[in-house]
Amino acid sequence: MPEKELDYIRSTDAAGSTEKDGGIYIDAFDKQDNAPPKKGFAKFIDGFRRADAEELGIDPNLSEAEKIAIMTANSPLTRSLKNRHLQMIAIGGSIGTGLFVGSGSSLHTGGPAGLLIAYILIGTMIYCTVMSLGELAVTFPVSGAFVTYNSRFIDPSWGFAMAWNYAMQWLVVLPLELVAAAMTVKYWDAKTNSAAFVVIFYVLIVAINFFGVRGYGEAEFIFSAVKVLAVLGFIILGIVLCAGGGPQGGYIGGKNWYIEGAPFPNGAKGVITVFVNAAFAFAGTELCGLAAAETENPRKSLPKACKQVFWRITLFYVICLTLVGLLVPWNDERLLGSSSADASASPFVISIRNAGIKGLPSVMNVVIMIAVLSVGNSSVYGSSRTLAALAASNQAPKIFGYIDKQGRPLVGIIAQLLVGLLCFLAASDKQGEVFNWLLALSGLSSIFTWGSINVCLIRFRRALAAQGRDTGELVFTSQVGVIGAIWGAFLNTVVLCLQFWIAVWPLHSSPSAEAFFSAYLTVPVVIVFYVGHKLWTKNWQVYICAKDIDIDTGRRELDLDLVKQEVAEEKAYIASLPFYRRVYNAWC
């Protein structure tokens, strides 16, 4: 049965209605623009003008939260991301230096078994989180997505803290990644000043985002395709090398699991350290949910994208890291590289060099450089959309809500690019100290974001039950349900607690204030945002009661009876398919 795409109410009758079913009252959809279309340079200049602010016939009796939900649901952001963009962002978006390089230090710290255990556990948490995000984002494909869900389902102050936490995470990531990209070039050219390459990569990121969400989508499609092909190629090569098929021959098998110290060289504390590192390696997984508001058909595309996460975790992380643990000894000194972008510290590169294969290490360094640029590109997208959502929610200066006629949150993009100029500190003698603190500022941001997404799903389901509704009105539900959301929230809490332990008593070093704040700075920053908002608004309510949560405003599917009928028909259609088709539909 072909899926149908329902849309927002688009009639003047609905706009004038005082009914609150859905809470969306749009007054200007039928407005006609009789002006002749602009061409050439005039069209180019006109594209930077603010998008026409639609007159939203908002019921003045609505609460502030409901008004905000309406505004975020009707953002001028363009819905031009296609299914292929979202699928590739989901499957390859967060494959970066955390896998290609960071897994090296994790192998050295936790050993081959510790590495595998940590990534599998964190992988289950990520899968549950993305499933929770998918259910919410398909139901409420609004500007800012999970950035705004916290204010709706948990508490406005927590939403404020989480939104600014997420915006800051991406704001500081751009200069870090630009410098990291320039450092990858040192693999071939150690003489040229890094600042020269920083300029080149900075201009590239500016050019990509000049083309709006479509530019971001196409760039990520290419970047992710390269990363996926590289990982698949390594898996094939790794199996051949383990079996003794490399140029130097010799069966490797599992011997590196039995060398001195393996498979747990640093015991439980080493595994816990890897546990935290593994969480950082998955950062950016949630971006497919943020892109829901700019996707042509989120009802069809987003569930497929969420299901792809299972394959990314299984294929790209678990299988790859199993091979890494087999091919590279945990005590190889090269694993302790000087930076997160040092290709010589990549276990992928080390395994290729150990096999005596020439040329491929350089190819792998290109992949690492592309992975770094991909994260930098995503940082502009993530921060600008978050700032726009904050402005629409009255939680940031209104200027950040400026969205031009091409659907670009222009002021947010400019703000991110200005912060990106910090990358030129690469020429400073204090660059290491500055970037370490920038990294500390964003270190635990993803943990807070993922934990909050799971709590939002739990609160949403509670609100449905409290208001006499059920999941029969949802076009997509999490495959792991509330139990999965509880597991995801629990594991994120565990990571925060374990990181506190590592921050107070670091592995192989003495406790110090500097070590603590470099590992745990995000937590006091979040507390300051949360308490500050409480003091400013004088709203002392800890959480929104389930019966008071708005579960209608911002929905794309407003005719709930029709939705229930379509969901029932779709389930019946799937049940009639052959077994292999049902399995494929469940996992793909």
Swiss-Prot record:
Molecular-function annotations in GO: amino acid transmembrane transporter activity
Transmembrane segments: 88-108, 113-133, 160-180, 193-213, 221-241, 271-291, 309-329, 366-388, 409-429, 438-458, 482-502, 512-532
Keywords in alphabetical order: Amino-acid transport, Cell membrane, Glycoprotein, Membrane, Transmembrane, Transmembrane helix, Transport
Subcellular location: Cell membrane
GO biological process, one term: amino acid transmembrane transport
Glycosylation sites (chain numbering): N61
InterPro entries, sorted: AA-permease/SLC12A_dom, Amino_acid_permease_CS, Amino_acid_permease_fungi, APC_YAT
Predominant localisation class: membrane
Induction field: Expression is under control of the CSY1 amino-acid sensor. Induced during biofilm development. Expression is repressed by nitrogen sources. Expression is repressed by the antifungal agents ketoconazole and flucytosine. Expression is also regulated by NRG1 and TUP1.
One Pfam family hit: AA_permease
Disruption outcome: Leads to a growth defect on medium containing phenylalanine, valine, leucine, or methionine as sole nitrogen source.
GO cellular component terms listed in the entry, alphabetical order: membrane; plasma membrane
Similarity comment text for this entry: Belongs to the amino acid-polyamine-organocation (APC) superfamily. YAT (TC 2.A.3.10) family.
NCBIfam families linked: 2A0310
Function summary: Amino-acid permease with broad substrate specificity. GAP2 is the only amino-acid permease with very broad substrate specificity, none of the other GAP permeases is able to transport such a variety of amino acids. GAP2 is also able to transport thialysine, and thus probably also lysine. Functions as a sensor via detection of some amino acids including methionine, leading to a rapid activation of trehalase, a downstream target of PKA.
Designated name of the protein: General amino-acid permease GAP2
Taxonomic placement: Eukaryota, Fungi, Dikarya, Ascomycota, Saccharomycotina
Gene: GAP2
